[in-house]
Amino acid sequence: MSPKARVLIYVLRRDLRLADNPVFHEVSRLSQQSQHPFTHFLPVFTFPANQVEVSGFVSDSAKKSPYPEARAPVSGFWRCGKLRAKFLAESVWDLKKDLERIGSDLQVRVGTVHDAVQSILQGYKENNQVDIAGVWMTNEEGVEEKREEKDVRKLCKEFDAEFKLWQDEKYFVDEYVHFHKIAAQYTRLTETP
């Protein structure tokens, strides 16, 4: 009998690039070791129902979406405009193509990160031929993002899976010695030492 497959799940949210993503680099490094901690790698992106209107993903037009409309609770405005939705979709498909080019793939879900991760963990638990090597996410700022991280951490505990939260590397304030030198405009921020 062959040993069980060990799957490492990487939950992507805003870090939708392959080239400069530290998690993908670490996975690549670990996979080249003789004793790597996983046999399979599963990157997952979930179109967030609380941010993006997902009713269009329901295949049967007679059925209602299981998620409420993605409107701001106070103002009632849509939380995602068409340009942001287009940018997000293009980023997801570009990442999927980049991963396919190197022999991997991206699982795309719709709903909540909690529901997606729970579904995957439950499916592997029922399979009984697969162990979860871990669930990795990148730390994000924001109340909803922190709630997602807490929910996934709780799910991992429930399913006895290791949870790792990576530091977001978009910016480190500690890198700036003199705060008065931080540019007020983004175009100048990229030039700030």
Indicate residue ranges for each PLM-predicted region.
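N-terminal beta-strand-loop-alpha-helix module at the start
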Residues: 1-104
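Beta-rich, aromatic/charged-enriched effector core domains that present basic-aromatic interfaces
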Residues: 105, 112-193
